[in-house]
Amino acid sequence: MNILLATMLAATMHTPGVVIDDSPTRVQTDIKIDMEIMGTLRPKSVSEISSSRWTLDCGGMDREHADWRAVRGYVAPLGIARIRQQAGWARCEKDPGMYDFAWLDQCVLDAKRMGVDVWMELSYGNPAYEGGGGRHLNAGFPSSEEGLAAWDRWVQAIAEHYKGVVIDWCIWNEPNGKTSGNTIEQATDFAVRTAEILRSIIPNARIAAFALTKA
């Protein structure tokens, strides 16, 4: 299935290459700099480097704040070897039991085709279920029996879909936000149940429990 999707994406996502300006005049400014220009840094693409510390945050596409097509042409040429993506449960499962990964595949499979790894964040919640958690920043975890059961099914579905494609996972974004209402006990239980599902499907999964915040 993933091979077919990747083939389709290679055809439908083709766009002319982005020209990265590395000339000495690439930055135009009225600021007077009393120094001699010694040279210009030329970015190296993903194919020219063995490793990179750069990670591009794509978390926001799940709530349609951004579009992968607007940035895709710059990622690999600038040497960005990994992207962080929020899976967007509420966007992938708008109707209970019906998963649509098309929008996420557009980003994930295209990135992999370019040699860019994906770090997948599973949050947020899904208001399609009573007690399914919020779908926004500082959202609360799924809390009801129905919501937690639906979350378990969601984790299983996305893990099965991206098995062999995504190894790096994160469970929830900023669960300790001041308005989230999440407790340490909830966070611990939630992390364990989610990690157990991921590892049952992807034994070599690398799992980060949470991305925390001071806000």
Protein language model regions, located:
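Threonine-centered tandem repeat motifs in low-complexity domains
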Residues: 7-8, 12-13, 20
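Boundary/entry segment of secreted carbohydrate-active catalytic domains
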Residues: 17-81, 86
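Compositionally biased, proline/threonine/alanine/serine-rich low-complexity intrinsically disordered stretches
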Residues: 15-18, 147
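Sec-dependent signal peptide recognition
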Residues: 1-7
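Generic secretory/membrane-interface signal
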Residues: 15-16, 24, 115, 168
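Substrate-binding cleft and catalytic face of glycoside hydrolase catalytic domains
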Residues: 75-215
